[in-house]
């Protein structure tokens, strides 16, 4: 007997019982995006490898350790996308969407990183990202954060996420801080773990978000990033904080907050939670004013964020169990008798025409009334429409409210109107 082929480790199947809650959450997110005037862009999951090396940085963990890279039959190096911003910028440049224009874009789909799989962190994972181009003031940074705050309210998780903010300044200011930080770390090299020693010269800002408690204790005496900010970045950050305060959005300034990708400048932010154990970040982003030019376009200010959907689903399920998936079926059409199936299918098609948006499932595979009502209950139907031989003969149907148990005989021409009233 042939051995069963299973999914690749860290790349998961999501079965119908799971995808239903995903669909409701995604629908909520998309509705909010639409209310802010953001437009969807759809991007390839495979890009040329140099795109990510140039955008993310060759000495980042993502590029050095985590990318799925391969050669195609022409010998070109291709990579499964580890994040969405680089591809979105590439598309904007390629299709002339960015220069001297304002764009508010969002995308959703799978990303790929070769990490150690654990709860909330997978090798294939799903992100929803937003990117705004052509606007450089702190007001658009604030709007993106306000948008995410509206998501949390809509999902019922506002009390379980907190906002952390920082400014990492201009590229020049960050270079000055980098030198000061490296000098400090060199003086205390014996207290660093091997990972931090490696990062000290390649990407020293990542030492700031080390998870090692001893390193974090050492960093209490390190130079503060805020002391090295240029004046424009200070003003930009102060403006952002003022806007968030006016909007009633609470935040904490975390001067050790940096992002793991090299393209960020000025604003960086994270929404974090204590409800998912070690995987605390739900949504993160910031400003990347130099990336468009870095990838071959003309200088264009930009800001954006990405959110891991697996973690968001876990969080919603953990803290808001009342946020349930929509039922698979609203109406279940029960048919019993030798000649009723054809009539039932015809009635079902008519009801789908007259009740757009209502989910109606017709029973197939026979079965007595008891079995069919059991199926209706399994699919979460609120109402059953019953056709037996006598109903077909006299042009009626029985409409049964599966919650109250009340049932009514209705002329088939009036079934849609009756259902509309019953379903509200």
Curated annotation (Swiss-Prot):
InterPro entries: aa-tRNA-synth_II, aa-tRNA-synth_II/BPL/LPL, Anticodon-bd, Anticodon-bd_dom_sf, His-tRNA-ligase, HisRS-like_core, HisRS/HisZ, HisRS_anticodon. It catalyses: tRNA(His) + L-histidine + ATP = L-histidyl-tRNA(His) + AMP + diphosphate + H(+). One of its GO terms (biological process) is histidyl-tRNA aminoacylation. It is an enzyme of class 6 (ligase). Keywords: Aminoacyl-tRNA synthetase, ATP-binding, Cytoplasm, Ligase, Nucleotide-binding, Protein biosynthesis. Its EC number is 6.1.1.21. GO terms for molecular function: ATP binding; histidine-tRNA ligase activity. GO terms for cellular component: cytoplasm. It comes from the Bacteria. Its main location: cytoplasm. Gene3D superfamilies: Anticodon-binding domain, Bira Bifunctional Protein, Domain 2. It is found in: Cytoplasm. Homodimer. Belongs to the class-II aminoacyl-tRNA synthetase family. This is Histidine--tRNA ligase. It comes from Escherichia coli (strain 55989 / EAEC). The lineage of its organism: Bacteria, Pseudomonadati, Pseudomonadota, Gammaproteobacteria, Enterobacterales.
